């Protein structure tokens, strides 16, 4: 697949003397992160908060409930596949805006219907919008980060900190809305989150687009992806493993007797831990240009997913949320850094697209497969065990990915 380069302007923010030059790339990527905040942090992950109420009110099985995340992941994969071409046509920032608007509109649709097919289509659209926003935004963020080579990994990770922040926001709202309005109020949660998203999107929409933001008529280099095949498999396993945990963990907490406060605290812990990752992992990401940073982060991720199997106390659940959260959003940063370190800039779109496809297939298969296992076994504990096993296997694979040689990069 030959993908176009998604170019980023040197500055998205106004060149005001009040904004120091060293700060502009960080602020730019934080503003770009509003796309993933709405499309992923709220649009995808908040579903876990309303899943128990939707499942009870709409009389769904776990397989049916998990299908909503499966179709969302399929939409994400589709959005990721069209993101580069869309950005080539309309510009990278315009693609991020359009994808975020599509995700926001689909949140409103979720508040308007209880029909399974209509909800599935809305979840599909959320995924498409999120995929466009994340991939187009990720390419822009990677280019923005080049303005500060010494802090490039940190500046890039600010963009990928968007989903954890969205998790915190939804965690502070959804459980208490459900508690206030009672069973069957899942649609009110979607309405409130859609209204919140309409406020959050404003800075992204008013960000100026200078003439330098135009996408050049340049095509990406054809680079063999075979040398990074292990990385692709590892990312597939990560996609399948992490989404299973995030899909069912709130239902697990509720089944243990956790009320709104417990559910909110658990979810916010995941998000807060995830938001801290740019500072926690910056040295790890810079240590090695092969797969070892990804392997280390995935191992921590797997430990977090496995902890609930060792005990059900509030302290153990809180530890699980913190450990899982501090690792899960950094895997994408690590794989993007692997591409940036090992391939020429003109090959980034093709490599990132391949990683996105691998990840997308994994997270499409993960929820439905784990949901079917849960229905068959009758316990969410099996879902968490499968999640941890997939993440640990992904870590083992990543550890075998070596730094690409010059001949690999040029092949």
Range-by-range predicted roles:
Residues 342-377:
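A late C-terminal transmembrane helix in Major Facilitator Superfamily
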Residues 79-114:
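Conserved MFS/SLC helix-loop-helix module at the cytosolic interface between two early adjacent transmembrane helices
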Residues 175, 194-214, 397-401:
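C-terminal membrane-cytosol helix-exit motif in multi-pass small-molecule transporters
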Residues 106, 117-125, 315-323:
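Paired small-residue
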Residues 59, 91, 112-117, 311-312:
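Helix-breaking motifs and short loop linkers at transmembrane-helix boundaries and internal kinks
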Residues 122-161:
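Cytoplasmic helix-loop-helix junction between adjacent transmembrane helices
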Residues 79-91, 277-289, 375:
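Helix-to-loop junctions at the C-terminal end of transmembrane segments
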Residues 48, 227-268, 275:
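Extracytoplasmic gate region of multi-pass secondary transporters
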